[in-house]
């Protein structure tokens, strides 16, 4: 279609694109409109995941018999272990089928609900003040880092180099957690663990947002959503750990 048939379109001299399409980053070759559509889809999925997590976790927190069942019975303990392991197990087929509809959505639902139960059980034995503080700070941090990453990408910065460092830091964090389980070191060590976890997952939010802008293919919307959802949930749990230890 000729340009004169679309009077509302205007060449963007700065980016060299027609219709005023603005690139998300300087070396962008794909259509910004398609990439923005992909980004909106991923954030829509994350929003539904977070809403489901809030709904399930709130049910666990406010319906006290649920928390009591998990905390005081052997069956509840066994079910709690199953719920902790389920997200890890489901991630394997979810990664394999993340491009196959509707299996990917089914697995995503199972993954989200199981993780939401684990979050709910953590919150059930935490004061409301601490939960609110962690939730507010998580929201502020996630929004700030997301805006910063989009701005940095626009300016030409790239965060792909963070991948190996974050993975190494995550391994250290997991070893620290195992040590803490078998050899509890007290409140100070718990706060140190929470601070390290918060820093690491802040880095992962920047790293995964950068991948969302530049690297994920359009068929990888499920895996992109899972990555950022895990970053947000883990950041919340890390902040919850810090505030609980400081309370």
Curated annotation (Swiss-Prot):
Any one GO cellular component localisation term in the record: membrane
Source organism, top-level taxon: Eukaryota
Name of one Pfam family that matches: Bax1-I
Keywords associated with the record: Membrane, Transmembrane, Transmembrane helix
Membrane topology label: Multi-pass membrane protein
Keyword presence, NAD: no
Keyword Glycosyltransferase: no
Coiled-coil annotated residue ranges, if any: none
Compartment(s) where it occurs, according to its Swiss-Prot or TrEMBL record: Membrane
Family matches, as InterPro entries: Bax_inhibitor_1-related (IPR006214)
Disulfide bonds, paired cysteine numbers: none
Bilayer-spanning residue ranges: 42-62, 75-95, 105-125, 130-150, 165-185, 188-208, 222-242
Family (UniProt): Belongs to the BI1 family.
Protein name: Protein LIFEGUARD 4
Provenance organism: Arabidopsis thaliana (Mouse-ear cress)
């Amino acid at each position: 279609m000729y340009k004169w048939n679309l009077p509302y379109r205007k060449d963007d001299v700065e980016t060299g694109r027609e219709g005023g399409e603005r690139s998300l980053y300087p070396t962008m070759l794909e259509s910004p409109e398609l990439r923005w559509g992909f980004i909106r889809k991923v954030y829509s999925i994350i929003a539904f995941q977070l809403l489901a997590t809030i709904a399930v976790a709130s049910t666990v927190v406010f319906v006290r018999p649920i928390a009591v069942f998990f905390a005081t019975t052997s069956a509840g303990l066994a079910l709690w272990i199953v719920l902790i392991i389920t997200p890890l197990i489901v991630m394997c087929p979810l990664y394999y089928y993340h491009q196959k509809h509707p299996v990917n959505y089914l697995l995503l639902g199972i993954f989200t609900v199981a993780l939401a139960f684990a979050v709910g059980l953590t919150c059930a034995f935490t004061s409301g003040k601490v939960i609110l503080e962690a939730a507010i700070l998580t929201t502020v941090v996630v929004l700030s880092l997301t805006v910063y990453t989009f701005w940095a990408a626009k300016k030409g910065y790239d965060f792909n180099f963070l991948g190996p460092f974050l993975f190494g830091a995550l391994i250290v964090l997991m070893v620290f957690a195992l040590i803490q389980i078998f050899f509890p070191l007290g409140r100070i060590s718990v706060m140190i663990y929470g601070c390290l976890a918060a820093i690491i997952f802040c880095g992962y939010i920047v790293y995964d947002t950068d991948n969302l802008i530049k690297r994920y293919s359009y068929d990888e919307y499920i895996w992109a959503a899972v990555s950022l959802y895990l970053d947000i949930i883990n950041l919340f749990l890390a902040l919850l750990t810090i505030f609980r230890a400081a309370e």
